[in-house]
Amino acid sequence: MDIKRTILIVALAIVSYVMVLKWNQDYGQAALPTQNTAASTANASLPDSVPAGNNGANADLPSVNAQNGTTGLAPAPVAVSKDLIQVKTDVLNLAIDPVGGDIVQLTLPKFPRRQDHPEIPFQLFDNGGERVYLAQSGLIGTDGPDRASGRPLYATEQKSYQLADGQDQLVVDLKFSENGVNYIKRFSLKRGEYDLTVSYLIDNQSAQAWSGNMFAQLKRDASSDPSSSTATGTATYLGAALWTASEPYKKVSMKDMDKGGLQENVAGGWVAWLQHYFVTAWIPSKSDNNAVQTRKDSQGNYIIGYTGPALNVPAGGKVETSAMLYAGPKIQSKLKELSPGLELTVDYGFLWFIAQPIFWLLQHIHSLLGNWGWSIIVLTMLIKGLFFPLSAASYRSMARMRAVAPKLAQLKERFGDDRQKMSQAMMELYKKEKINPLGGCLPILVQMPVFLALYWVLLESVEMRQAPWMLWITDLSIKDPFFILPIIMGATMFIQQRLNPTPPDPMQAKVMKMMPIIFTFFFLWFPAGLVLYWVVNNCLSIAQQWYITRSIEAATKKAAA
């Protein structure tokens, strides 16, 4: 039974690692080409114009059902200028294309692209040739100015807008007129917020009734995720997701869109594009019935979006419609406030029901300590305390195994290579000594889901991004740059083995000796925060096992005396 126990432990270790890789293969992105984007300074991160020849922003608008009227559309004005409208708040820097009013550039000044260059903000949206990722919205339908043949050219009072000191809200109006109808596309941004409102004010001064639909969509090409690290072979999910009445969180991968588009009518809800640490989501009015669509356009871009209900404006009448756009970090508390299910875009995988409470507890510990590294250490101590009864039972079983080791050696000498008789004799000995040979496996079985859940917490939570601990650990979300923690972890595993009884089978003993080396190799590229958890967990296990083993040995000697 000892060899079976060893095989089980080894299998759990290998299967756990394979499960992480398999989850990424099933739900992560396919192998994608890497991009080579030149670094730029913070002030130059949003160019004044879109490079000529890149029409990814204006291609392939959604269609409306024939009953809403999509035929006989006149061509819209063609842009004569590609100057972008610059908009800056304390947390968002974005550029709006006057043709269509799409957000084609967006950076996050609070999130540096790299730790060693804090002046360069992370770029979320880009339509500059290297990558296509943008947020589009417009008015389509019978009288809508956004058509497949062209987009409206909006005018603004100025070319740049900035949230001033002491100002809590910034409003940017884009104006366009056609056939007696005046349109205002309004962007409303707030201080400290990553969500903004995009509104359409339609003033029908013509003699005819106006009809159309608002659409909003996210468009992205197949380029790699610039915020993801694949050193462990487990890149996080890059793809679309949406809310439906039956599923509060439904993924639609690029592979799904390659196979065909999705169409579904949803009341309210949201559509989003996910990447490592960041999410972009369109959130329509909760009362609207929307037609959600996913598709791949003629240029190979992947699109998820929705088309709202019909808008009817009588002659001389006015109508306003709006949607919310979130473009920023995956902050769970904020996402939950914006729309139900949106917090699930912090994708913890199939163990989310364990990961979410772990993150909740970790966040509360951090609110007291102010350091994520020390918070992980305290969390480890709490988890270890929670599993103390199971661990104690396991270590008692190991201590009894150690006590009967001489008897096992005698059985081996007696039966030699007769494995069947040896196994029968061992089982009789275990039964006589009241030892469960698999008793040491239970804590491993129970802790493995917690370990995997914590892995995804540390990998997916934006709070861990570039979070320092101390000394050489400046980012808990990536591997230890000097591999010191993995080596310490391997050493602690070796010490644990010395406290365990020596397996009677030579092959089993060799396998067990290899385990610290195997685990050390796996952990070389794991997030430093996860390795820190495992090191502390091993140290606590060593102390606990040493104490219990010595207590049992002392009790045995006392009973013998």
Curated annotation (Swiss-Prot):
TM spans (from-to): 7-27, 342-362, 368-388, 438-458, 469-489, 516-536
Predominant location category: membrane
Subcellular location(s) per record: Cell inner membrane
Gene Ontology molecular function, alphabetical: membrane insertase activity
Pfam families: 60KD_IMP, YidC_periplas
Single GO biological process annotation from the record: protein transport
GO annotation, cellular component aspect: plasma membrane
UniProt keyword terms in alphabetical order: Cell inner membrane, Cell membrane, Chaperone, Membrane, Protein transport, Transmembrane, Transmembrane helix, Transport
Record's bilayer topology term: Multi-pass membrane protein
Family: Belongs to the OXA1/ALB3/YidC family. Type 1 subfamily.
Quaternary assembly: Interacts with the Sec translocase complex via SecD. Specifically interacts with transmembrane segments of nascent integral membrane proteins during membrane integration.
Function: Required for the insertion and/or proper folding and/or complex formation of integral membrane proteins into the membrane. Involved in integration of membrane proteins that insert both dependently and independently of the Sec translocase complex, as well as at least some lipoproteins. Aids folding of multispanning membrane proteins.
Protein name in UniProt: Membrane protein insertase YidC
Organism: Pseudomonas entomophila (strain L48)
